[in-house]
Swiss-Prot record:
Name under which the protein is recorded: Hemin import ATP-binding protein HmuV
Gene Ontology CC terms, in alphabetical order: plasma membrane
Protein keywords: ATP-binding, Cell inner membrane, Cell membrane, Membrane, Nucleotide-binding, Translocase, Transport
Residues given in the record as ATP binding sites: G34, H35, N36, G37, S38, G39, K40, T41
PROSITE patterns membership: ABC_TRANSPORTER_1 (PS00211), ABC_TRANSPORTER_2 (PS50893), HMUV (PS51261)
Record Pfam families: ABC_tran
Matching CDD domains: ABC_Iron-Siderophores_B12_Hemin (cd03214)
Gene3D superfamilies the UniProt entry points to: P-loop containing nucleotide triphosphate hydrolases (3.40.50.300)
Domain ABC transporter, residue spans: 2-238
InterPro entries documented for this protein: AAA+_ATPase, ABC_transporter-like_ATP-bd, ABC_transporter-like_CS, P-loop_NTPase
Bilayer topology: Peripheral membrane protein
Complexes and interactors: The complex is composed of two ATP-binding proteins (HmuV), two transmembrane proteins (HmuU) and a solute-binding protein (HmuT).
Length: 270
């Protein structure tokens, strides 16, 4: 279990997170949602030890700050919003970087398995810089999967931290990536994903954390968090949530959204 207790972050002179508390469970996909500048990425970067913070973050009861970098690398893998590679690496070389960080390097075929999992079999010899943005994003996901391929190792759950994992993808590959996240969680691992697409969040998340202005506005199951009132408050526009008869799955109708004023413009990107 990953617990976040009273996390505060200041970037420069600007307070970004204000006393965030949240819990993420292994076996679940936890989605962090909110308007641009709400603090989603900052919170994720605090949880991955990339951003200084005050407060406490615990992984399976141990303070995350007490872990050595190599220990964290065997327990969790991070997919950032964007990854720039300056050198002309092939796709296979990029995915192999995940083996250097994790503990699954003994499986020589693992990079190929990871590429197959993201639908990129046969791309091993291509240069990363020659791929489309969506293909590069899937290569990076394959690298992350190779790092923590087994969702549970030595009896301990491992974690995927995904920052907008479907931002560059078409709808088919969006579904594929979210299914990978769900499958990883069902295998006993934990997944924490920053999401913008509320419909995908409703479809795939087990737990939703809704941020607004650097604070946790609501947390719980999608149906508990994603209500007309709460989402409209968070996003500063009128939103209508609907449920489809089969399975009562929550979904939104974006074409019914109406601006209610400049509630969230000119905010720091989250």
């Amino acid at each position: 279990m990953l617990t976040v207790e009273n996390i505060e972050v200041t970037l420069g002179a600007t307070p970004v997170l204000h006393g965030i508390d949240m819990v993420a469970q292994p076996g679940q996909v936890t989605a962090i949602v909110g308007h641009n500048g709400s603090g989603k990425t900052t919170l994720l970067r605090a949880m991955t030890q990339e951003t200084p913070y005050t407060g406490t973050i615990r992984l399976d009861g141990a303070d995350l700050a007490s872990f050595k970098p190599w220990e964290l690398a065997t327990r969790r893998a991070v997919l950032p919003q964007a990854s720039r590679i300056a050198f002309p690496f092939t796709v296979l070389e990029v995915v192999r970087l995940g083996l250097l960080a994790g503990r699954d390097g003994a499986r020589k075929a693992l990079p190929q398995e990871a590429l197959a999992r993201v639908g990129l079999s046969g791309f091993e010899g291509r240069y990363y810089q020659e791929l489309s943005g969506g293909e590069q994003q899937r290569v990076q996901l394959a690298r992350v999967l190779a790092q923590v391929w087994e969702p549970v190792q030595d009896g301990q759950p491992r974690w995927l931290f995904l920052d907008e994992p479907v931002s560059s993808l078409d709808i088919g590959h969006q579904l594929e990536v979210m299914e990978i996240a769900r499958e990883y969680a069902r295998g006993g691992g934990g997944v924490i994903a920053v999401m913008h697409d509320l419909n995908l969040t409703a479809m795939f998340a087990d737990h939703v954390v809704l941020l607004a202005d650097g604070r946790c506005l609501s947390a719980g199951r999608p149906a508990q968090v994603m209500t007309d009132v709460t989402l409209s408050q968070a996003y500063g526009c009128t939103l209508q949530v609907n449920t489809s008869p089969p399975g009562d799955a929550t979904y939104l109708l974006p074409h019914l959204a109406r601006r209610t004023g400049g509630a969230h413009h000119a905010r720091r990107t989250g």
